[in-house]
Every structure is written in C-alpha cells, then in structure tokens.
Amino acid sequence: MGLKQKILFICDKNERTSFGRLTMNLLDAVHEKYDAHVLWLKTPKFFPDEVAAKKPASVPVEDARGFMAHEVWAKSLYTGFFAFRSPMKKVLREVAPDVVFFIRPELGFLVPIAKSACPSAKSVMFVHDTFAETLYPHSVKFKLLNMFFIRPTVCADSFVYNSGWTRGEAAKYFGKKMADAPGKVIGCPIDSALFNAPESPVTKEERAAFRRKNGMRNFQGMCLNVSLDEPRKNIDTYFEMARLRPDVAFVRVGKFSERLRNIVNEKRLYNVFHFNEFNALELREFYRHADLMVYPSFLEGFGLPPIEAIACGTPAVCARASAVKENLDGVCPLVTPADDAEAYARVLDRILAGENVIDAGAARKLLDYCSMKGFSERVLGFLEAQG
C-alpha cells in the first residue's frame, strides 16, 4: 500500500463552535483514507482557555482521534491578516500537504499564502453562505472584511458547498471564476450519536413534567427556536406566534439582546422563555420534549436545527425559503410567506390535536443524507475526483 495523501484543514474557531465541529466532522470523514492534519488559527476570543499556555511556535500534537494538530496564534483574526502568514507558511512547508482545505471564506486571504508555500497542493474552500458578503452593504466592518479577507477566496482551486442554494448564491456573488471551478455540494452532518429519538416516544405527561421542571407551568405545549438574533432569522415572527398562542410556552435558545427584550416586554409575552445557551445534552432534551421546532428564517445556508429536532423525534415547521426549502420540502410543513405567524400557529394547533405532520419516509432519507456516513462518502468522493 502506498503512502496516504496528506490533507491539512485550516480553521479559526474552537470545537464548540459550528465551524470547529464541522472541522472535526471533516477530519473524522477523511482520517482513514488520508494522512490528516489540522491547523488551528488560534486567538484569545475563540481559545481563551489556552491563552496562558500558548507557545511561541506551532508544536504538532498527535490527537487520539486520528490526526495531527498544529496551531499558530494571533491577537485576533484581524491582526492575523499579517500575524498568521509567516507561521502558517512554516507549518505548510513542514507538513507538505497534497490538499489544503479552508473551513470558511473569511480565511480566503490565506489561500494565496498556501499556494506560495505549497505550489503543488490543491486548495479547497468550504462555502456556507454569502451573508457576510451581501447582507451588510453599509457596514464598514463587512466592506473591509469582504475586500481584504473574503475576496481572495476565488483563488482556491475548488469549492465545496453545504447546499445547492449556497452554490447558486456564491456563483452570483463571486462570479464566473468560482462558478466554473470544480465544486460539489457535500451538505452538513448531524451528530446522530447525540441527536436521536429516545427508545420510547416521549409521552404527553413526560412533556408536561419537563416543562414544569424548567419553570414552564400551566402551558398546553412547548415550541422551540434555536437561533442568533439577526434579521434573517425572523425571530419577530416567532414572537408574534407566541402572542397568538398564549397557552403554549415558546422557548428560544440564543442571546437575549436588548432588541428582543423590548419586543417581549412590549407584547407582554409571558409565555416566552429565553436560554442563552445549552450544552449538547441539554439541547437534545429540549429537542425531544418540545411539541414543535419553529424555524422561520428568511435565509439559511443549510439549516441544521430543524433537522436535529426531527432526528430527536420532534416535528418542525419552517419557512419555505433558501436552503431550508431545499432540505425540508416534503419532510415537514413549510410556510410562505415566511412572516405569516398565523400559518405557523395553525401547524402548532394540528400537532397539539394529535396530527402527524412529518413524512416519515422523506425524513429518513434526509437523516441518511445528513448522517456521518453519507457526509463522509460525499467528502471522499469529491477529494478523489480532484486526483
């Protein structure tokens, strides 16, 4: 058997973030077929626990999960525009990878550095959406981010995408060079070892006990939303749904901003409960005990939370928009227009009346697609096609 090809993943977020978890998924997908390495671009913001122990040079560490880990440090991603370059070149020359795989376009400024350090290596960029590029046209921060950090993304040799919708949007924004480059939609995996249905379906009594345990008393059911406070997430519609159904508890997981606090207070939404964050096991229990996952986002590059909820045995209702439509059409109810709060509320009524709103066959097909097995096959298929 010949030597395995080397692949180096480059990520700037820790393993508790979505990009960090995705990097670990990619390492898991390839480590049996490739000599796998990861370069963590570390900053105090995303690796605070390691700041005191950081070393002046990258010291490779063999991880028990089957890969070699390297690291370089900067004070922030922005200072890393200069500070990451030289130490990253050093790592690249030491590893001499056949493939350099960047986890997100915000690291595009490093693509030319990788090409300079390893001219024969193929560079791959994972594109997740174009929100940073298109949603904030008047923001100086995002203008600079696009100009200096993201634009060089088009210099990569090939691209992978989380959805067909993202691929289309990226082609429109980045233009012909990306559109004509080799590429593949590889999706995103869910952690099926964590997000799965209990052995026995959760009973109505168990749901009520769970609500009481978490401070939600005298409600007929519970809805769940997991999201950032961004305009594209359409949280206002979720809160309007709460106003329409005051006898149901509406849980939101995410930062409780001043804007959201004002909406809750102005509408006197005593049935809205906020949790800033959960650990993974806590989130699974909320998924399992909710009556309905509500995901009214206008724009999503993929949309994992409703898929995770369905994997846990809980129905979802989503907006018929962007990649959510691509993934969930035919699986669960989709609402259009996305801000029709009454339409979401009617789906809730059907569920509380005992109706099944999920197509079981379509859901199984979706969960198979989002399994690590399916994800690994697509990643490896793409890499093998690149030679």
Each language-model region and where it sits:
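Short alpha-helical donor nucleotide-sugar binding micro-motif in glycosyltransferases
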Residues: E285-A290
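Nucleotide-activated donor-binding/catalytic signature segment of Leloir-type glycosyltransferases, i.e.
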Residues: L260-R284
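Conserved acidic donor-binding segment of nucleotide-sugar-dependent glycosyltransferases
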Residues: P333-E342, D349-E355
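Conserved donor-binding/catalytic core segment of Leloir-type glycosyltransferases
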Residues: L8, M216-K233, A242
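Short hydrophobic beta-strand element within catalytic cores of glycosyltransferases
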Residues: P315-C318
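Active-site proximal beta-strand in glycosyltransferases
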Residues: V99-F101, A114-L135
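Membrane-proximal helix-turn-helix segments that form the acceptor-binding/catalytic region
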Residues: K89, K141-F159
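Aromatic "clamp/platform" in nucleotide-sugar-dependent glycosyltransferases that forms part
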Residues: F298
